[in-house]
């Protein structure tokens, strides 16, 4: 694991003495072979990883729980993954490096729990997180008592605290758990022989 969420999954599995199956860098058919071989029951990954499992060809009934996290997902991907793993309970986790896991969702809509609803604000569609939910670090900069997450949301039901993530406020996007600057990617792509322009 190379990221905070990966470390959390690793240590949770380690403490529970669960078998870990390394599928990093493997082709789609190799991943499915290992799921069958080891009767994998839990998968925790980014939407990018789950998209690599497409297209749907077969059901895998050993999988009991699927967890999405690390980047924005969508309803279509949840539905397709449910077709592949029909017996799995599917959760979508919102976590930040600064605060850890904060919300879980069944689909692409998240709900702020009533018990901590007063620890969040939304300003100009950006989700702000209260300092009491964050670890202690000199690298955090606060606006009063709130940390700017740079995550933009849209309310589905503001009264009930239900929202959906729209995008990021800054240029950095999360791809497979890595922070990526699309502008830098564009420069590299444009340097390839035969590429005139990328958009």
Name every feature range the model reports, one short phrase each.
Residues 1-52, 91:
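AMP-binding/adenylate-forming
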Residues 20-22, 44, 65-68, 174:
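Short catalytic-loop micro-motif centered on adjacent basic/acidic residues
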Residues 42, 54-110, 119:
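Gly/Ser/Thr-rich phosphate-binding loop
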Residues 3, 74, 154:
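Nucleotide-sugar-dependent glycosyltransferase donor-binding/catalytic pocket residues
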Residues 119-148, 152-154:
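AMP-binding/adenylate-forming core of the ANL superfamily
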Residues 43, 144, 150-199:
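AMP-binding/adenylate-forming catalytic core of the ANL superfamily
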Residues 48, 71-72, 133:
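Alpha-helix/helix-capping structural signal
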């Amino acid at each position: 694991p190379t990221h905070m969420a990966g470390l959390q999954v690793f240590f949770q599995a380690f403490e529970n003495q669960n078998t870990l199956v390394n599928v990093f860098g493997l082709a789609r058919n190799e991943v499915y072979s290992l799921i069958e071989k080891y009767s994998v029951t839990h998968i925790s990954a980014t939407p990018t990883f789950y998209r690599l499992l497409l297209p749907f060809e077969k059901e895998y009934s050993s999988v009991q729980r699927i967890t999405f996290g690390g980047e924005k997902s969508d309803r279509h991907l949840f539905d397709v993954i449910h077709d592949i793993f029909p017996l799995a309970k599917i959760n979508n986790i919102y976590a930040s490096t600064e605060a850890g896991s904060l919300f879980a969702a069944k689909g692409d809509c998240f709900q702020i729990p009533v018990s901590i609803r007063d620890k969040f604000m939304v300003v100009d569609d950006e989700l702000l997180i209260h300092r009491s939910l964050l670890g202690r670090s000199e690298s955090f900069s606060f606006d009063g008592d709130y940390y700017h997450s740079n995550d933009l949301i849209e309310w589905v039901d503001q009264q009930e605290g239900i929202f959906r993530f729209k995008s990021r406020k800054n240029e950095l996007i999360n791809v497979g758990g890595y922070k990526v600057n699309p502008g830098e990617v564009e420069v590299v792509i444009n340097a390839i022989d035969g590429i005139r322009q990328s958009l």
